[in-house]
């Protein structure tokens, strides 16, 4: 069992830290009242659940409940429950800038100067800072760099970092672009099987339409270019912390060309070892006469 208490100054990056730990497979709870830590630890250590990595964010947002933290930590030690503390810190000037940019009030100085709140918080957290197993100063760290530091400390040996989950969506422009799209490609420049009587009734999944759409040189070149682009983008998105990518392929009605192209891209990514899903959003819409969709 690895039991991590994440704490530190407001604005120092605890939210990003807990997200990074979650990506590493930690069961995470934000702002748990310190008085509940002993009972929670007991349940985790003594249960037969498969949860073996826990991360709790504990900070001064708990108000007067925060004062129970040291008593709870003492209980953990006496009970033999191992824990470690990760403390997030940053320079006063950086914290002030972050608060001003986010337009948030400091929890210890809601009606006063941000600096006063930071100074009060430092004093309140001094003992916890000295107890910390790991201290990360985020003053000069970008989000990606903080995640890399978290990974270097808490990623288990041999653990593979989370992969990017790619979802390829085919759609029809007449029903609207999927609102969660990251990348949108328009394949209406390709010859349309809809206007060929013997192909109209088939979808892009079926062989007659697929063979027709893929028979053109521009189709093959387009798919090759999309595959090359995604091979370049996926590792770079991962470096920046992105975990999901929605690639939307659109034609007029979402039944023929976009379906064939989406399937082709899906198969290529799968063969490349990517984690990939496929969704033909509008494949039945011309039949069902649906309206605009999300």
From Swiss-Prot:
A Pfam family hit: PapZ_C
Q: Which GO terms describe its molecular function?
A: ATP binding; GTP binding
- Which Gene3D superfamilies is this protein grouped with? P-loop containing nucleotide triphosphate hydrolases
- Binding site residues for ATP: 8-15
Please verify whether the record's keywords include Nucleotide-binding.
Answer: yes
Keyword line: ATP-binding, GTP-binding, Nucleotide-binding
Query: Which InterPro entries is this protein grouped with?
Result: P-loop_NTPase, RapZ-like, RapZ-like_N, RapZ_C
Superkingdom is Bacteria
**Transmembrane regions:** none
Q: Does the keyword ATP-binding apply?
A: yes
Q: Which residues bind GTP?
A: 59-62
Protein family: Belongs to the RapZ-like family.
The task this protein performs is described as: Displays ATPase and GTPase activities.
Name by which UniProt lists this protein: Nucleotide-binding protein CA_C0511
Give the organism the record lists.
Answer: Clostridium acetobutylicum (strain ATCC 824 / DSM 792 / JCM 1419 / IAM 19013 / LMG 5710 / NBRC 13948 / NRRL B-527 / VKM B-1787 / 2291 / W)
Upper classification of the organism: Bacteria, Bacillati, Bacillota, Clostridia, Eubacteriales
């Amino acid at each position: 069992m690895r039991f991590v208490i994440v704490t530190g100054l407001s604005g120092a990056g605890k939210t990003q830290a807990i997200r990074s730990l979650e990506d590493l497979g930690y069961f995470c709870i934000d702002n748990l009242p310190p008085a509940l830590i002993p009972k929670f630890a007991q349940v985790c250590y003594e249960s037969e659940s498969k949860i073996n990595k826990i991360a709790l964010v504990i900070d001064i947002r708990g108000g007067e409940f925060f004062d129970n933290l040291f008593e709870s930590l003492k209980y953990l030690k006496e009970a033999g429950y191992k824990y470690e503390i990760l403390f997030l810190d940053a320079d006063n000037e950086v914290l002030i800038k972050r608060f001003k940019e986010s337009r948030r009030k400091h929890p210890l100085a809601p009606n006063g100067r941000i600096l006063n709140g930071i100074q009060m918080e430092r004093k309140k957290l001094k003992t916890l800072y000295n107890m910390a197993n790991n201290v990360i100063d985020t003053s000069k760290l970008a989000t990606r760099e903080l995640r890399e530091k978290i990974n270097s400390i808490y990623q288990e040996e041999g653990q593979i970092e989370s992969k990017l989950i790619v979802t390829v969506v085919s759609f029809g422009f007449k029903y609207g672009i999927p609102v969660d799209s990251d990348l949108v490609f328009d394949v209406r420049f390709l010859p349309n099987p809809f206007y060929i009587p013997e192909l109209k009734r088939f979808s892009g999944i079926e062989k007659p339409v697929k063979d027709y759409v893929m028979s053109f040189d521009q189709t093959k070149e387009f798919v090759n270019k999309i595959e090359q682009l995604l091979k370049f983008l996926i590792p770079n998105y991962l470096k920046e912390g992105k975990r999901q990518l929605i690639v939307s392929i659109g034609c007029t009605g979402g039944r023929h060309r976009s379906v064939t192209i989406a399937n082709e891209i899906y198969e290529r990514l799968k063969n490349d070892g990517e984690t990939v899903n496929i969704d033909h959003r509008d494949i039945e819409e011309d039949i069902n006469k649906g309206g605009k969709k999300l």
